[in-house]
């Protein structure tokens, strides 16, 4: 019999919520183990890898004086200009949105016993949704400028009294994510996500280590730009991935660093494909 009074009602509600959460975690765990999940992982990670390879190629061109936006929007624009651009964008968009849903399922399944893994999975899911949605917008004939969107949001934030603080915190969080990527590469922690056959382990290590380090450095620079924008109260200083990579061309030795990061991003893209094939 349910408890009487407000306290009893609250207790019943709490137990009901706990049971619902447990059922959701159990259902998510079953979905995660389904054979279809491995196909979603393989296709989604391959799409993710393709996007990174294209971004890296554009960044390499920027280092040698070519134009282009070395970010997700630039990658989608480049894909759209290929003979199979429309089909490629639809495949990439759908695959990444599906991969995002898969990541959210993992987050729910891990939320009770592995909180850190759940947070990481949820973060990946959000990232995949953003990139997948961008691909679908381009597939439908639309366009998104990542740098303009970043500057617009930063301008709006800086108009509020606590805006600079919010922008600075955002930058520090992004930089923290970048540092985590670097650490994951240096410590070979990416093997937590991929289980290649023994004969391919060194290949995956040769891809994952520089790939994670390069992506981590790029993301850290993005975070740094947000902090600079917050300190200078200038939204124009904030930038996304393209802004971060373009900024390297203005500092001594930056072009060399940009070439290294560009190659690293392409290597990371190949790693993503291996992760899709040999996901743990």
Question: What is each of the regions a protein language model found here?
Answer:
Residues 2-91, 95, 276:
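An N-terminus-focused feature that recognizes amino-terminal "leader" regions
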Residues 6-10, 106-125, 185-209, 276-280:
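Cytoplasmic juxtamembrane regions at transmembrane-helix boundaries
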Residues 35-36, 58, 84-184:
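Hydrophobic, ordered structural segments
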Residues 35-52, 115-128, 206-217:
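Alpha-helical transmembrane segments and their helix-start/interface "positive-inside/aromatic belt" motifs
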Residues 60-71, 136-151, 227-238:
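Membrane-helix interface motif
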Residues 74-79, 153-157, 200, 235-256:
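Short, membrane-exposed interhelical loops at transmembrane-helix boundaries
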Residues 101, 170-173, 177, 245-278:
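Alpha-helical transmembrane segments and their immediate juxtamembrane interface regions
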Residues 208-249:
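Glycine/small-residue-rich hydrophobic helix-like segments
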């Amino acid at each position: 019999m349910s408890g009487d009074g407000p306290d009893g009602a609250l207790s019943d509600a709490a137990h009901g919520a706990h049971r619902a959460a447990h059922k959701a975690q159990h259902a998510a765990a079953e979905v995660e183990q389904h054979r279809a999940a491995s196909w979603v992982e393989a296709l989604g990670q391959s799409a993710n890898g393709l996007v990174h390879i294209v971004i890296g190629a554009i960044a390499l061109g920027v280092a040698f004086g070519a134009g282009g936006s070395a970010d997700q929007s630039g990658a989608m624009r480049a894909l759209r200009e290929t003979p199979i651009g429309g089909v490629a964008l639809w495949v990439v968009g759908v695959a990444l949105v599906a991969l995002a849903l898969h990541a959210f399922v993992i987050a729910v399944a891990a939320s009770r016993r592995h909180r850190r893994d759940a947070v990481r999975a949820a973060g990946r899911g959000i990232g995949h949704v953003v990139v997948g949605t961008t691909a679908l917008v381009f597939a439908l004939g639309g366009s998104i400028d990542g740098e303009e969107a970043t500057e617009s949001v930063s301008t709006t934030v800086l108009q509020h009294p606590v805006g600079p603080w919010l922008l600075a915190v955002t930058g520090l969080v992004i930089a923290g994510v970048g540092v985590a990527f670097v650490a994951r590469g240096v410590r070979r922690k990416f093997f937590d996500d991929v289980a290649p056959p023994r004969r391919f382990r060194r290949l995956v290590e040769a891809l994952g280590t520089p790939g994670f380090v390069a992506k981590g450095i790029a993301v850290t620079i993005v975070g740094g730009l947000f902090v600079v924008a917050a300190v200078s109260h200038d939204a124009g200083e904030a930038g996304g991935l393209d802004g971060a990579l373009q900024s390297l061309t203005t500092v001594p030795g930056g072009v060399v660093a940009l070439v290294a990061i560009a190659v690293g991003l392409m290597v990371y893209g190949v790693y993503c494909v291996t992760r899709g094939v040999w996901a743990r």
